Every structure is written in structure tokens, then in C-alpha cells.
């Protein structure tokens, strides 16, 4: 009986460790998307201060996309400016990797308020 309890305790500890590692990896990827979108938000805010409107041209705000993992780099997210007006903008970070193999690709979005939300969960 004692050996069974030790085995069960070991298995539970092992599973807890696996779940913690998975959660830790997901948090790291999520923070990558949030960091990239916060940079876009700051660049768009500076652009608007200079030109009195937002832009949908990612090169105009001088955002430099890190090299994607699909191209031999380390970035898991492709950032794009989806729309912009005088008073609003929307930017998206879409994962280029299906992290859990379910066919869904993580998508995060930021707007002119700086509010970053996950719009598609992977």
C-alpha cells in the first residue's frame, strides 16, 4: 500500500511539473505577442503626435519585425497594421506556429487605447 501511495505521489508530481512547464511556455509566447504589440502601440502614438493621425503603414512607424521561426529566427508572431484612421488604429500579432497542433493560430490585437487582447486562442 505504501509503495502505491509513493507511486501515485510521484505520478501526480510529474504531471504537475509537466503542466507547469506547458503553462510557462504559453506565458512566454503570449508575452512575446504582447511585447511586440506594445511596441507598435508606442510607435503609433508617437506617429500620431507628429502627424495628427495614425498610419496603416508598418514601415512608416519604423517597426522592425524580428525574424520569424519559419525563416530561421526566433519570433513566433508576425505583426501587421490592419487599419488606421485619424483617431483609431488596429494592429495584430498572428502566430506562425500552431503551438498545440489543433489547427488554430494564436492572434492578439492592440488598438489606439493600448488595450491588448487575445482574439484567437491557441
Please give the residue ranges for each predicted region:
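Hydrophobic membrane-insertion alpha-helices, especially the h-region
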Residues: 6-17
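Periplasmic/extracellular, small/polar-rich flexible segments of pilin-like filament-forming proteins
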Residues: 49-122
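Conserved hydrophobic/amphipathic alpha-helical signal-anchor segments
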Residues: 15-65
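Positively charged n-region of N-terminal signal peptides that target proteins for export
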Residues: 1-4
Amino acid at each position: 500500500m505504501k509503495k502505491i501511495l509513493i507511486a501515485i505521489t510521484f505520478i501526480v508530481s510529474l504531471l504537475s511539473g509537466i503542466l507547469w512547464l506547458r503553462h510557462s511556455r504559453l506565458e512566454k509566447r503570449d508575452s512575446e505577442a504582447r511585447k511586440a504589440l506594445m511596441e507598435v502601440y508606442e510607435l503609433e502614438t508617437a506617429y500620431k503626435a507628429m502627424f495628427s493621425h495614425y498610419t496603416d503603414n508598418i514601415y512608416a512607424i519604423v517597426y522592425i519585425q524580428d525574424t520569424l521561426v519559419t525563416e530561421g529566427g526566433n519570433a513566433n508572431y508576425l505583426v501587421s497594421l490592419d487599419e488606421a484612421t485619424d483617431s483609431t488604429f488596429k494592429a495584430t500579432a498572428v502566430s506562425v506556429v500552431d503551438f498545440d497542433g489543433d489547427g488554430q493560430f494564436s492572434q492578439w490585437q492592440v488598438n489606439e487605447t493600448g488595450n491588448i487582447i487575445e482574439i484567437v486562442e491557441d
